[in-house]
UniProtKB/Swiss-Prot annotation:
This is Succinate--CoA ligase [ADP-forming] subunit beta. NCBIfam families: PRK00696.1, sucCoAbeta. ATP binds at K46, G53, R54, G55, E99, T102, E107. The keyword Ligase applies. The gene is sucC. Residues 9-244 form the ATP-grasp domain. It comes from Pseudoalteromonas atlantica (strain T6c / ATCC BAA-1087). InterPro entries: ATP-grasp (IPR011761), ATP-grasp_succ-CoA_synth-type (IPR013650), ATP_grasp_subdomain_1 (IPR013815), Succ-CoA_synthase_bsu_CS (IPR017866), SUCC_ACL_C (IPR005811), Succ_CoA_ligase-like_bsu (IPR005809), Succinyl-CoA_synth-like (IPR016102). Binds 1 Mg(2+) ion per subunit.
């Protein structure tokens, strides 16, 4: 679950990290009032969306008077911001962050993520601040400094000092960096965070370190332990179908094709998309209904898939390991009747009672195509959707 920048900075402030004074505004007038509270003659206004690249898209601006603040808010509030990280529709802007202006002498990068390879939280830092860390990793990987956090003892000050020295920090900056490092580590653990990025972490003209940006993502699996962070959830930033799927514990990701895919198991779902592509088709989604594929969940999955107007055919690929294929077949039939599916549906069943499941589908009287194998299913659904792309 992603947080907005202003929410991330609220967390940073709770843990004693240096952030700019700023306020989120929902109206142009509130944005002007926020500038009055902050004071000064220059401010930075930022569109609050769950996407990077806001600056290049015009969603971040340095303003020098209240009229500019009002004009910026009027331009963006209620509109969608399109960046290189969003789709063509962009993300809706419902809040503007107004904060004090910060002088920048140098930009650094500091972040932390759960590294699956080492099975530990890994801190990363670089002198290449303000740049996507993926770009740095690809082009100049030697510029990324890392520190693995031992889960037994937690983050240690010496790890922060080692990185600070390598970043070229001196004197009081080393102490400040250590405080920021330890604060982020504490925040990461206590709030069940999956990703933190401070990009950029800046050295101001006076030599002090300052967190100029905040990207925070919480581990959604731990949301039940973090009720305060759950309150920060902004569903408007998510695909409506993905949000609906999450309510039914369905793993759904929208794609650009015209063949809807409903599968039980993430690995099988990816394999299904691959074989559809192999035979010239284009998947419209990734959808994993999981092990408990009940009639109700299958029906909801159909509704979500069919809410995409591009879908011309649906491929249901079920391996009956935990569940029986005949029960799944009955669920599919019930779902097709309930939802009123009018496009071709191809079903491939394998595993426990697979033959019985295919018989149930064949005798249903519905226009459901029972495939004999995964290859056959892929070929049939591609044909039903209009042929190879």
């Amino acid at each position: 679950m992603n947080l907005h920048e202003y929410q991330g900075k609220q967390l940073f402030a709770e843990y004693g990290l240096p952030v700019s004074e700023g306020y989120a505004a929902e109206t142009p007038q509130a944005a002007v009032e926020a500038a009055d509270r902050i004071g000064g003659t220059e401010w930075v206004v930022k569109c609050q969306v769950h996407a990077g690249g806001r600056g290049k898209a015009g969603g971040v601006k340095l303003v020098k008077n209240k009229d500019e603040i009002k004009a910026f808010a009027q331009k963006w509030l209620g509109q969608n911001l399109v960046t290189y990280q969003t789709d063509e529709a962009g993300q809706p802007v419902s809040k503007i962050l107004v904060e004090s202006c910060t002088d920048i002498a140098q930009e650094l990068y500091l972040g932390a993520v759960v590294d699956r390879a080492s099975r530990r939280v890994v801190f990363m830092a670089s002198t290449e601040g303000g740049v996507e860390i993926e770009t740095v990793a690809e082009e100049t990987p030697e510029k990324i400094l890392k520190a693995e956090i031992d889960p037994l003892v937690g983050a240690q000050p010496y790890q922060a000092r080692e990185i600070a020295f390598k970043l070229g920090l001196k004197g009081v900056q080393i102490k400040q960096f250590t405080q920021i490092f330890m604060g982020l580590a504490k925040l990461f653990e206590e709030k069940d965070i999956a990703l933190i990025e401070v990009n950029p972490l800046v050295i101001k003209d006076d030599g002090n370190l300052h967190c100029l940006d905040a990207k925070v993502a919480m581990d959604s699996n731990a949301a039940y332990r973090q009720p305060k962070l759950q309150e920060m959830h902004d569903p408007s930033q998510e695909d409506a179908r993905e949000a609906q799927a999450a309510k039914w514990e369905l793993n759904y990701v929208a794609l650009d094709g015209n063949i809807g895919c409903m599968v039980n198991g993430a690995g099988l779902a990816m394999g299904t998309m691959d074989i559809v592509n192999l035979h010239g088709g284009s998947p419209a989604n990734f959808l994993d209904v999981g092990g408990g594929a009940t009639k109700e969940r299958v029906a909801e999955a159909f509704k979500i898939i069919l809410s995409d107007s591009n879908v011309a055919a649906v491929l249901v690929n079920i391996f009956g390991g935990i569940v029986r294929c005949d029960m799944i077949a009955e669920g599919i039939i019930g779902a097709v009747k309930e939802v009123g599916v009018t496009i071709p549906v191809v079903v491939r069943l394998e595993g426990t009672n697979a033959e019985l499941g295919r018989d149930v589908l064949a005798n249903s009287g519905l226009d459901i195509i029972a495939a004999s194998s995964l290859t056959d299913a892929a070929k049939q659904v591609v044909k039903a959707a209009g042929g190879a792309a």
